[in-house]
Structures are given as C-alpha cells and as structure tokens.
Curated annotation (Swiss-Prot):
It catalyses: N-(5-phospho-beta-D-ribosyl)anthranilate + diphosphate = 5-phospho-alpha-D-ribose 1-diphosphate + anthranilate. 5-phospho-alpha-D-ribose 1-diphosphate binds at residues 84, 87-88, 92, 94-97, 112-120, 124. Belongs to the anthranilate phosphoribosyltransferase family. The lineage of its organism: Bacteria, Pseudomonadati, Pseudomonadota, Betaproteobacteria, Burkholderiales. Homodimer. GO terms for biological process: L-tryptophan biosynthetic process. Binds 2 magnesium ions per monomer. GO terms for molecular function: anthranilate phosphoribosyltransferase activity; magnesium ion binding. Pfam families: Glycos_trans_3N (PF02885), Glycos_transf_3 (PF00591). This is Anthranilate phosphoribosyltransferase.
Amino acid sequence: MTIAAAEALTRCIEHREIFHDEMLHLMRLLMRGELSPQIASALLMGLRVKKETVGEITAAAQVMREFATPVVTPNPQDLLDMCGTGGDGSHTFNISTTAMFVAAAAGVPIAKHGNRSASSSSGSADVLEALGANLQLTPEEVAECVAATGIGFMFAPAHHGAMKNVAAVRKELGVRTIFNILGPLTNPAGAANQLMGVFHPDLVGIQVRVLERLGSRHVLVVHGKDGMDEASLGAATMVGELKDGVVREYEIHPEDYGLSMMSNRGIKVSNREESRALVIEALDNVDGVARDIVALNAGLAIYAGNKADSIPEALALAFETISNGSARAKLEEFCAYTRKFQK
C-alpha cells in the first residue's frame, strides 16, 4: 500500500498514525533518495512532533535492515548486540563497549553495531581505534572475527550506505529524528539478543516492543533515571525486557545486587584517550565506579545473551570474568585479530 507524501504529512499534522505498509513505502522512498529535501525534512519533523509509534518505527527499521549490507554468521539467534541510541549528553566513557569484552569473555557471542561520536566525547568506533582495533573490515572479515574471537564490530556507515540519501537533510535539520532511534534496531548480523540503552524513558517501552515485532529473542532496553542510556549506579534503571515472547517493564537498583550507589562524575571524559584509560582501568579490575558500572552492564548483557538464568547470577559471572583477567585478555585478542586484516 502506498501513500502520497502530502497525505503522510496531513496524518502527522493531525496526529494520526501512518500504517505499516504505508510507512514501508515512505521509508523506501527516503532510503532511495526519491523524496525532495523539503518533503523529506517535513516528514521527519512531522513524525517527531507527532511522536513515532511502535508500528511506524518497526516498519522503518524493517526497511533499514532491507537496505543494509549484511554480516552472515551461522547462528544469528545466539548473537548479542550492545548498541545504544546515544544522545544522553552524559559524556561518560564507553561503558557498553567495555562491557562487550566482559560479556564475550563469559561466552556471549557479540555482534556490536556502532559508530563514531555524534553527541558524546567518544563513540564506540573512536575508543576501539584508540585501543588498537582495526575497524575497516569487510562483512566476511567481521563474520570471521566473530567466529575466531567471539566479537565482531560492524562500523555503521560501512553497512548502511543508503543513509547517504538522508545525510544532508539530517545534518541541516540538526535535531533528533526517527533515524536517531533506528540505528540500534538495524543490526546487520541480525543479532536476536540485545542490550540497548536509550536516551529517554519513553523509549524503554517503545523500543522493546519494536524489537518484539521484529522477532528478537531476548532483549533488555535500559534507561538510567539519572538520564544515562546505560544501566546506572547513580539512580534506579528502567528496564523493558522481552523474554520467551513476553514483555515486562520493571526497575532495578544497584543496591539490589550489592553495589553501592555512586555518582557518574568520576567516569566523565572529554576525548577518546580519556575513555581508553577508563576502559583499561575497568578491565584491569581497579576498584571503583568504572569497573562496577561496566560489571553491571556486562551482567545485563550476559543475562540477555542467555549465559545466565538471572541478573544476580550474570552479575557474579561478570565480576569473575573481570577479576580473573579474561575480559582484559579478550580485548587484546579482539584488537590483535582485527589487525590481521589491515590492508
């Protein structure tokens, strides 16, 4: 079913939903660059003001997946992504990227989808390069990396070439649009399990239901009530969980797991080198907020990756993996393996 751009804009103005097939059609036009910049920007802003629905986001994510360059692995049902929306303005170090090494060392196969910094001081790609990883990998090399090390990193621009058709409009608008929440929904390896941080509390329930419709297996969508797009030590964390086909929403508190409430001030960074230093500090088991917040998020990842039956069990495994040095060893193994492919 198609829809004229004018009708779609009218729906947005009147706060009425654009139906699934109609949204598929509009999104394909956007991704092919077949809408004028004026219509494209009006549509993106109309959706933002109206507030995108679960159905609209689901359809848009399906089209982005359709246009993506895939990474083919034998068992996408076992893979876990740890990709957040970003945009929380907290300027903390790369917590989920660090937690990735802990989860992988605990046996969770990781297919992480990431990018350079947009609003933070250091994006996942920035800090991984600072740590010595080579990110210029083909899809086949990423798949080989997953098979050999348990981790693959997919640099978003290399897998979403069609995004160039909306890049100029997004840049000129300079505000958040639906594309800011689509990235974590469009893993090129089709990872069925996910730990996703979101920048706004409303997105917890929205994103987990989108992933339910997209066929995900086990998902945790989190938002720290202090504003972080991670599980936080500074406040309670809102969680939306999809497991066994059922969505639940609840809160977790650091003290529930024997962790101290701590301010995030000590983990703020201004560049990728400062972030790199905290990544190493956390993985070297230095007592403090960096290690504990990484362990908390890694615990959630281990649980979402189905290597533990509960969050407390997963958190204990995360701390063990850090303290015995296997998480730090996983970092070195991953970086060394990616450098094999340097041209």
